Amino acid sequence: MIDRFGRPLEDLRITLTHVCNFECFFCHMEGEEGDNYILSKEDILLVAKVAKNFGINSVKLTGGEPTLRRDLVEIVRGLKQLGYRDVSMTTNGFLLKDLAYKLKLAGLDRINVSLHAISRETFKKITGVDAFDRVIEGIKSAIDVGLVPVKLNFVVNRRNREEVFKFIELSQNLGVNEIHLIELHPVGLGKLAFKEHDDLREIEEYIEKISIKKQIRKKHFRPRYVLPSGLIVEVVKPYANPIFCAGCNRIRLSVDGKLKTCLYREDNVIDILDILKGEYSEDVKEELLGRAFMIAIAIREPNFKYKI
């Protein structure tokens, strides 16, 4: 499906829970401010089934921390049984060592691990948890079982800016495929922490100089730089960036049962909780959810636009 701004809808991002065992001071919470209502596995898979009918072929599981859901493996398995080409997950990595093999067997294709520091001290300052070594072990386990490409997310801010290039070195040593250097943006807790925002221009300019190739990713038109080691560094700058919004191909299912068309906005969401929890047959629910998706596509628009 194509929205009225010519953007294809290709990716479904599902928030499985708001609960997290870390306390990152900038967490954007997927742009959600509602209660931590947990949709059932059946609810999630029904929405995913309808989304698949609209041509969506990729699902990203997020949180909170998705590995805290006891039915995570079953959800992954169900998504693959629906025929999704790509099922991935973003995690803090705390429980990954124990879950990596089970998730791989269930059909998880790849994984993003949030690692916002390269030292135990900075890691604890950012997350509130002394778990740096445990997360590193989780990353190694993901690589070992074949959850590739393994990508690391690093939200750049004034507390960790000096660790960026050591983070690149660590990533190369770990053997990960790709890292994302992400701009802190004012969503969720990031609204309160935006004073820690740090401009990525100087960092990106240096990375471009040392790279051997530059690419532009279709999603969000993000710049990607291939280093001599083969590591890919992707720079993610969503804030006040109309180019980023012009390349958005996502729709989100919130933890409290809403179709969210934009990370930054709460004024154009479609509440589908009553459909999911209503006393309807599954066929009727599918029809009503299909209508909800049509409305969501119709009202979907970039948050940041070019001013002409």
UniProtKB/Swiss-Prot annotation:
The free-text note explaining how the cofactor binds reads:
Binds 2 [4Fe-4S] clusters. Binds 1 [4Fe-4S] cluster coordinated with 3 cysteines and an exchangeable S-adenosyl-L-methionine and 1 [4Fe-4S] cluster coordinated with 3 cysteines and the GTP-derived substrate.
High-level lineage: Archaea, Thermoproteota, Thermoprotei, Sulfolobales, Sulfolobaceae
List S-S links within the chain: none
Which coenzyme or cofactor does it need?
[4Fe-4S] cluster
Chain positions recorded as [4Fe-4S] cluster 2 binding sites: 245, 248, 262
Query: Do you know which SMART domains this protein is assigned to?
Result: Elp3 (SM00729)
Protein's organism: Saccharolobus islandicus (strain M.14.25 / Kamchatka #1) (Sulfolobus islandicus)
Similarity field? Belongs to the radical SAM superfamily. MoaA family.
Record: residues binding S-adenosyl-L-methionine: 64, 114
Positions of [4Fe-4S] cluster 1 binding = 20, 24, 27
Instruction: Give, as in the UniProt entry, the pathway in which the protein acts.
Output: Cofactor biosynthesis; molybdopterin biosynthesis
UniProt xrefs under InterPro entries:
Aldolase_TIM (IPR013785), Elp3/MiaA/NifB-like_rSAM (IPR006638), MoaA_arc (IPR013485), MoaA_twitch (IPR010505), MoCo_biosynth_MoaA/MoaC (IPR050105), rSAM (IPR007197)
- List the catalysed reactions: GTP + AH2 + S-adenosyl-L-methionine = (8S)-3',8-cyclo-7,8-dihydroguanosine 5'-triphosphate + 5'-deoxyadenosine + L-methionine + A + H(+)
Q: Which residues form the signal peptide?
A: none
The top EC class, named as a word, is lyase
Q: Where is the Radical SAM core domain?
A: 4-224
Gene3D superfamilies noted in UniProt: Aldolase class I
- What Enzyme Commission number(s) apply to this enzyme? 4.1.99.22
- Example GO molecular function term? GTP binding
Q: What does this protein do?
A: Catalyzes the cyclization of GTP to (8S)-3',8-cyclo-7,8-dihydroguanosine 5'-triphosphate.
Which gene name belongs to this protein?
A: moaA
Query: Does this entry carry the keyword Iron-sulfur?
Result: yes
One Pfam family, please name it.
Mob_synth_C
State the Gene Ontology BP annotations: Mo-molybdopterin cofactor biosynthetic process
Q: What is the protein named? A: Probable GTP 3',8-cyclase
Q: Which UniProt keywords apply?
A: 4Fe-4S, GTP-binding, Iron, Iron-sulfur, Lyase, Metal-binding, Molybdenum cofactor biosynthesis, Nucleotide-binding, S-adenosyl-L-methionine
